[in-house]
Amino acid sequence: MFEAVEELVAEHADLEKKLADPSVHSDQANARKLNKRYAELTPIVATFRSWKQTGDDMETAREFAADDPDFAAEVKELDKQRDELTEKLRLLLVPRDPSDDKDVILEIKAGAGGDESALFAGDLLRMYLRYAERIGWKTEIIDSTESELGGYKDVQVAVKTKGGQGATEPGQGVWARLKYEGGVHRVQRVPATESQGRIHTSAAGVLVTPEAEEIDVEINPNDLRIDVYRSSGPGGQSVNTTDSAVRITHIPTGVVASCQNEKSQLQNKEQAMRILRSRLLAAAQEEAEKEAADARRSQVRTVDRSEKIRTYNFPENRISDHRVGFKAYNLDQVLDGDLDSVIQACVDADSAAKLAAA
């Protein structure tokens, strides 16, 4: 299983030499790329060295145990350590999502259920904002359309690590956690507008895309159609007397992004381009993932974005994730941002599926 690790150890040593050369840092973009790869390999190399050392220590202990039975317990303990390191190394060798270090743009759309769905979209927004606050991420509402009762028909939020340029540690970006949130979220509760106390079911859709930098996506200006219009508020009333809202269409793919929250047309255009870049990057990645998934579909089912991924049942205070069979009765805490146990269940299931396929 670990034949390829020796090659990674050699690559790690080569990167260490390159990064020690001051001339390498004159090209900052290349230096960042080398540093990122070095950081990715460091835990693999460290664990592999511990694994090898434990194996050597175990052989030595076995030799001593032949003459001194007191060493038998040490052999047993070292054997246990080696098994643990073997499993840790297997996990480290699972192919990583290249976007795990990235920040994200999270979009919540009200779905079936009218006003109640829009109110639920607002609850989801608050949940994600609270979760980000707990972790120390930064959030920025890019664009939103409020409903008449105070919910959201549509809201887009940028979620960033503290530095605002993705994670400094490999695999610790916002995407690594929030990518499992994409899909249809269903709510079961008595709506505020329900006079007879009947439980209703409604839903809101969540779309999560890794935020793309300009270097990630090349966009030809000739492929864009830019439309301007007046901003609108709840109920569709105009809130601006100038055509400051912007809608950008990427003609080759039909991908559309719009923004109306900023005060000027230029600011709205910049935000719309930001959303468009992330959507185009996500579309390209999904196409690549689809091709890879077609080849392995018969072997493994991984956690992915699918319809009705989660149910929020208010009468029972229950949260259920249907993809991984997760169920807990702390819905009030989850909606207050205590999402880690739900997300970790998805992370663990995804890792297990990838390990089984490796």
UniProtKB/Swiss-Prot annotation:
Modified positions (N5-methylglutamine) are 237
Q: SMART domains in the record, alphabetically?
A: PCRF (SM00937)
UniProt xrefs under InterPro entries: PCRF, Pep_chain_release_fac_I, Pep_chain_release_fac_I_sf, Prokaryotic/Mito_RF, RF-1
| Assigned keywords, A-Z | Cytoplasm, Methylation, Protein biosynthesis
Q: Where in the cell is it found?
A: Cytoplasm
GO cellular-component term (any): cytoplasm
Question: Listed GO molecular functions?
Answer: translation release factor activity, codon specific
Post-translational modification here is noted as: Methylated by PrmC. Methylation increases the termination efficiency of RF1.
- Main site of residence? cytoplasm
PANTHER family listed in its UniProt record = LD18447P
Q: Which family does it belong to?
A: Belongs to the prokaryotic/mitochondrial release factor family.
Task performed by this protein: Peptide chain release factor 1 directs the termination of translation in response to the peptide chain termination codons UAG and UAA.
Q: What is this protein called?
A: Peptide chain release factor 1
Chain's gene name: prfA
